[in-house]
């Protein structure tokens, strides 16, 4: 009887050890390839950024391919860099395409808001102020409201809607935490009142 109990206990111990070893083996089996994939994506991302920063514009097609293949943080960040390059080259339509494509697959709210603000800035440069306001109004997160209201004030000022501009800037100033930004907003308001 005592021998039977020992066999049951040792069998349980062996089973637990077997499953533990099996679990550890499987976790390494599945985790290692994911780590390698992330490292490869990071290396490819670094290469893409180098291509964007290079003076040669022929590299940009491969950058665009990287962005469409990588619908993740690396694709979004690459898209932001490429859009910046297009903006500096005065190619606003291509910049808009990059930002809009990234906006479609980006799930992180703060990145979405950054993309929307960049899109709105391009719309302002293209004198599509109503489109810019619509895009800015899509940003619902209160932590971005100071930036949204500041940009709305700039748009209203550009449209010669002075009262709306002052109101938007005052909202922005109220929501702003940075003293330097508050000072800039004050300068905008004081410039209008002269």
Swiss-Prot record:
Gene Ontology CC entries for this record: plasma membrane
Membrane association type: Single-pass type II membrane protein
Cytoplasmic side: 1-10
Record carries keyword Cell inner membrane: yes
Protein name in the entry: Ancillary SecYEG translocon subunit
Subcellular location: Cell inner membrane
Short name of one Pfam family: TPR_21
Family: Belongs to the YfgM family.
GO molecular function terms listed in the Swiss-Prot or TrEMBL record: protein-containing complex binding
Keyword Phosphoprotein tagged: no
SUPFAM superfamilies referenced in this protein's UniProt entry, alphabetically: TPR-like
Keywords: Cell inner membrane, Cell membrane, Chaperone, Membrane, Transmembrane, Transmembrane helix
Residue ranges that the UniProt entry lists as topological domain Periplasmic: 32-194
Listed transmembrane segments: 11-31
Main localisation: membrane
Subunit record text: Interacts with the SecYEG translocon. Forms a complex with PpiD.
Domain of life, source organism: Bacteria
Functional note: May mediate protein transfer from the SecYEG translocon to the periplasmic chaperone network via its periplasmic C-terminal region.
